[in-house]
Design a protein with these regions (language model features):
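A short acidic, Gly/Pro-enriched loop at the edge of an enzyme's catalytic core
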Residues: 116-128
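Core SAM-dependent methyltransferase catalytic element
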Residues: 206-220
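Conserved class I S-adenosyl-L-methionine
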Residues: 2-63, 167
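A short SAM/SAH-binding and catalytic strip from SAM-dependent methyltransferases
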Residues: 127-141
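A short glycine-rich, Lys/Arg-flanked "PGG" loop and its adjoining helix->strand segment in the class I
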Residues: 143-155
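Conserved beta-strand signature within the Rossmann-like core of class I S-adenosyl-L-methionine
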Residues: 156-163
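Class I SAM-dependent methyltransferase SAM/SAH-binding core
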Residues: 68, 74-117
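Acceptor-substrate binding/catalytic loop of class I
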Residues: 170-186
Length: 220
């Protein structure tokens, strides 16, 4: 889900957009149980750090064609981008998040789908925003989502990935369920192996919150 990561360590700031069985299904269930809490605390643009807002806006404004908010959660980013005149589709596997997003912005296209199976056509979108929507994915599962992102993107289409970062790839206890910190160079290597070119990396560390990074990439 697209979210503001610059929150206190105990807040429910990570939402995974996977589905299916096993670990992914447990994440979806946990998110569904806390969807209203998340939406009330973090489900608005007022909760977004100004630096993150500027980065995502600049990236999205530069896309040609539809932008997919992959793991849109309560849909605040989806609605915000639509309000800027961008053609955007919000996707989330959590039924309650989809309902909240549709109620908040009925004019915006929000669909229930996972990041591994978006239901979108091949090479049909200009950008994919994955703003903290992979943070609960087990590392071996991340390439599956990236393959789906690459499939739906036009050649040269943009991908923006937000993540928790640290010196080593490691799990940590999160308010929803286990999440992962990624070294930037390691996640960049995974993106490149999945058929993306990483063009830029943005890092931000604020006192009292988890370090995070954003990787700007494009389908190669």
């Amino acid at each position: 889900m697209a979210r503001d990561p610059s929150t206190t360590p105990g807040s429910p700031d990570g939402h995974d957009a996977g589905g299916g069985t096993g670990a992914a299904a447990r994440v979806v269930q946990a998110d569904d149980e806390r969807a209203d809490e998340y939406a009330a605390v973090l489900g608005s643009m007022a909760a977004v750090h100004p630096d993150d807002r500027a980065l995502v806006e600049e990236w999205a404004d530069a896309r040609t064609g539809t932008v997919v908010d992959a793991g849109c959660g309560p849909g605040h980013w989806t609605a915000h981008l639509a309000g800027r005149g961008i053609e955007v589709i919000g996707l989330d596997p959590v039924a309650r998040f989809v309902a909240i997003a549709r109620a908040a912005a009925p004019q915006v296209d929000v669909r229930r789908a996972t990041v591994e199976s978006t239901g979108l056509p091949d090479a049909g979108v200009g950008g994919v925003l994955s703003w903290y929507s992979l943070v609960h994915h087990e590392p071996d599962a991340v390439p599956i989502a990236l393959a789906e992102f690459r499939r739906v993107l036009v050649p040269g289409g943009g991908l923006l990935v937000g993540c928790f970062t640290g010196p080593v790839l490691e799990p940590f206890e999160h308010a929803v369920t286990t999440a992962y910190r990624w070294p930037v160079n390691r996640l960049a290597a995974v993106l490149e192996a999945a058929g993306f070119r990483v063009d830029a990396v943005h890092r931000r560390t604020d006192e009292g919150v988890r370090p995070h990074a954003a990787l700007v990439a494009r389908r190669s």
